[in-house]
Amino acid sequence: MIKVFPRFDEDLLVRLFHKGVKAQWSTADVDWNDPIQFSPSQSLALARMLTPVYLGEQSAMIGASVVLPQMANAGETSAQLYLSSFLMDEARHFEVLTNLYRRLGAEPLTIRQMPEMLRYHNRLRKGDRLDWVWGILISDIFAKNFYTLYAKAQPEALFGKLSGRILRDESRHQAFAEYYLKRSIPQVSGERVQALMGMKDELLGIMESMYQRLYADAEEVGMDGRGFLDRLRTDIETKARRIGLYDALPPSGRGPTSVRTSTSSPEPSANPTPLSFRGLKSSRCSTCFLALLCQTPLFQRAQCV
């Protein structure tokens, strides 16, 4: 239940909240006349490759709005406070990338063209708040690596400058997720930890499938897609060890894991608080990705009614 005067710990999450408040920016701060530095064909390829990241910003915005009251009910006041600034960040990224698509003169892929995006989105909303934070950390590592490429390669171009701004926000998101998971993982069962490891492998498998669809686009912009995925996998495994996932595994499960391409999902916690989207209404428009998600039978069966 929501408390009138909850316990309020001045921990890292509160400090991250303060940093987020001071670091706010908007589309009005962006010079949209900055050069693109892409040919028309490269702009189209970038628009396609950016699609999973773009949808991820929207998905994170919705997921945070569902998780926030769960944290309030659990008495996690500082996490609740931080997540409020996280919501603002994700909303800003969504708006900025929408404007970028207009500047590129291109549109993102549709769910029909890349159905793996819907699988990824649905996996993040399955389970409880611990599942969600772990999924967000994995997604943020992907986004960080993607944005870093362009922040370094095109520091004076429009997308390079946008990437630099977004990376500063993403660094806070990763710090939040890492702190929250480090604090939570020692309190869960070995079976629960194995489920989180399985979730990691499943999300990496979905990313692999998305890469197969975007291979030609990566080639068009000169991106080493295979090298990108290999570095991503290494970074995620490093983070998994840092937050204590491997240390918390039962002895029989401490061997190295491999990426699974199966679409099956690990079981969530025994009594999870599901990230229900029951409060959302099916969209009647067709102008955003969330509308496309809402119009799919799979999403409607997932309580989006």
Regions found by a protein language model. Name each.
Residues 1-289:
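Non-heme di-metal
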Residues 285-288, 294, 304:
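Cysteine-centered motifs
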